[in-house]
Amino acid sequence: KMNYQANSSKAEEFIHHEEILDTLEYAQNNKDNRALIEQLIEKAALCRGLTHREAAVLLECDQPDLIERIFHLAKEIKQKFYGNRIVMFAPLYLSNYCVNGCIYCPYHAKNKTIARKKLTQEEIRREVIALQDMGHKRLALEAGEHPSLNPIEYILESIRTIYSIKHKNGAIRRVNVNIAATTIENYRRLKEAGSGTYILFQETYHKENYETLHPTGPKSNYAYHTEAMDRAMEGGIDDVGIGVLFGLNTYRYDFTGLLMHAEHLEARFGVGPHTISVPRICSADDIDAGDFPNAISDEIFSKIVAVIRIAVPYTGMIISTRESQESREKVLELGISQISGGSRTSVGGYAEKELPDNNSAQFDVSDTRTLDEVVNWLLELGYIPSFCTACYREGRTGDRFMALVKSGQIANCCAPNALMTLKEYLEDYASEDTRQKGVRLILNETERIPNPKIREIAIRNLKAIAEGKRDFRF
């Protein structure tokens, strides 16, 4: 019988079913154990994280005053490591041809009602120009799995195309990649093409449930999918992004699996996930969220975000436009550090608006605001919308990035970088109202940069940006 082993290379040993069940039972038995919960909150306050078992107890806790303390700590930890910066990105769908049979995704091979589309390099060019004209600097590439139509060569060529496009003052400076599990060799090629974070959602960590949800196609292989991040790391990609699709399975099980996956990467490679995404199942063409009885409430969603934030303090946390404005507002302060804005979830949706009957979207967007409206809203809430990609371009990835975050030194890098990239956005793309709000925020925030030397350089650079210069970074 297999034992639980965090640093094993085998999926069923590092995501160990019995260990998860034991964890959930332990959490259930201790959900009213105030002394233990208070002790865990104190441990979490040291900002060194919690184990999956400890985090599971906090997630089960249902005493209002303790939940309040957990939320309060999540906000403090977020403030300490990420300040009030929110990184902006947009998804770019390259192709929705797919050979898999995932029953919760409208791209599944049997769906005959969806419009299938694959962008040519020229169409990618048009999409990227549209994205640059909105002000985006960071993209997440999305593509269905199709060995002949979306081979790795197509993805690599697309990455090169995206980086090559310089339109007016626009530039895409980091391309993160969300494609199906692949080989060590292909991960190496992605790295060489300049890809940023490699993102792959587990969907669910429950093997049996996973196999039911993925009946056909290469993705039906649980171990191959679950061990993808190990292969990515072995292929030299040191920033990886994990996530589950909450609502496919019971949230407690997947929450525990997610943290075990993070512990596994830390144990085996010395560096945990760069990001964790927390999407929730939602309706789309041929998919009705109501068919999934495990869908979670906003209240539980907030709790999940808060506990992940204190359990893995060094990991960025991402939400998409599946979440409504109200839902996003709540979780931003509890731990989210990266959001998408102005997203189109259809293939080719940026260059031209999709016709209603030409449905190629992966899911229905709840937050339909433009990027400028999202930036304006963030400024209104006191956040710094950041278009920064400096760490990736300075080679501060993997353990170098983590060391910087852990030392708390990131404030002297990130704050000025965020302000300078926001300034670029205000100069080149913002509406007048957004520009005025942004200028005020930049004035206030520049004063808060701890290191006087860096503050002085930042002020000088901000002035240069106003005069038309671009692309400064610490």
Regions found by a protein language model. Give the residues of each.
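Radical SAM enzyme core and accessory elements
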Residues: 1-39, 43, 326-334, 343-474
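An N-cap/entry alpha-helix motif that binds or orients negatively charged groups
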Residues: 38, 42, 46-86
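Canonical Radical SAM [4Fe-4S] cluster-binding loop centered on the CxxxCxxC motif
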Residues: 82-123
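Generic structural signal for well-ordered alpha-helices
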Residues: 90, 128, 156-163, 187, ...
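Core AdoMet radical
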Residues: 109-126, 130-233, 238-248, 270-277, ...
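Conserved C-terminal portion of the radical SAM core fold
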Residues: 143, 197, 223-287, 297-326, ...
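Short glycine-enriched, charge-decorated loop/helix-capping segments at active-site entrances
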Residues: 213-219, 290-294, 360
